C-alpha cells in the first residue's frame, strides 16, 4: 500500500464543488450577459451577446404562442369577459358614465343648452302638439278617463267653504246685485207690455181676495207708479232697495245657498248627464279652438326662460340621481342579456382587433435585456440559485468519487 496524503483526498471534492458551483453560475449568467455583442479585431466573440438577448425576438414569439395557446384561449377570454362584465360592474360603469355626461353638460354653457331645449319645446307646443290634438280629439274616447276623473273627483265634490261663500256673496251683492243695478233691472222689466200682461194675468187667474184686488183696484197703476218712482227718485230708491236687502237678510241667504250648492245633491242620472255634457263640451272646444289656443299660448311663452329654469331644476333635483340609478340598472340588464347571447361571437371578433400576440411580442422585444434579466431573476431567483448550489454539490460528489478511486488505487500499489 502506497502512502497517500490527505491533500490528495481532499482536493478533488473541493475542486469539484468549486468548479460545479461556478460553472453553473457562469452558465446562468451567460443566459443574459453580455447584453450586447463584443467584437475583437472586427470579429464577434462567440457567445456574445447572451443567449436570451440574442434570441429575444424568438423568445417573444414563443412566449406569445404559449400564452395564447394554453392560457388565453378563446374560452378563457370568454370566462374573463363574463367575470369582468358582471351586472353590478356594468351597472356601476353605466352609472358613472351617465353622471360624468351630466356633469359635463352642466359644466357647459347653460344658455346654449337652454336655447336647444327652448327650440325643441317651441316646435313641439307650437307645431307638433296642435296637429296631434286635432287628430286625437276626433276619437270618441279622447281624454275620457281623465275628464271623468276630473269631474268625479273635483267638480262633483266641489263645495264652497264658509269663507269662500261669504266672499262670493259679498261680491254678488256689491258687483252683480247692487241697489242701483236692481233699480235699473226693475225699470227694464216694467215695460208697458209687461205691466199689461201682469195685469191681465192677475185679473184672469186669481180668486178670492186676490181677485177682488186685481179686478177692483188692479196692479197696473201700482206698477206704473213703482216704475216712475225708480226713474225719478234714484237715490231714494237705491236706499230703499239697500234697506230691503238688509231687512230680508239677503246676504245670509246667499251664503247658505252657496254653501249648499254642490252636484252631490243632484240625482245620479242628472250627474251622469252633466258628466257626459262636460266631456263633450271639452272635446268640442278642443276640436274647434284647441289648436289655435295652443299656438297662441306658444307664441307668447318665453321658452328660453322656461328652459333655463327646467335645466336648473333638473340639475338640482334629487329625483335625478334615483332616475340615473334606475336607468343604469335597466341598461345593465339589457347589456347582460345581449352579452350572454352573443359572447362567443363578440370574443371571436375582438381577438383579431386586440391582436394580443403582437402586443406580447412587441412588449417583450421592447424590454431591455437588463430589465428582462431582472424580471426573470425576480420570478425564478430561488430556482436559479438552487441550480447553482446543485452544481456545487454534484461537483463535490464527483470529487469524492475521484478521491475514493485514488484511495483505492493507492491500496493496490504494493
From Swiss-Prot:
GO cellular component terms, semicolon-separated: plasma membrane
One Pfam family named in its UniProt record: DUF445
Transmembrane segment boundaries: 2-22, 386-406
InterPro entries, A to Z: DUF445 (IPR007383), UCP032178 (IPR016991)
Keywords for this protein: Cell inner membrane, Cell membrane, Membrane, Transmembrane, Transmembrane helix
Membrane topology: Multi-pass membrane protein
Keyword tRNA-binding attached: no
Cell compartments where the protein resides: Cell inner membrane
Domain of life: Bacteria
Protein family: Belongs to the UPF0754 family.
The name this protein goes by in its record: UPF0754 membrane protein tlr2287
Organism of this sequence: Thermosynechococcus vestitus (strain NIES-2133 / IAM M-273 / BP-1)
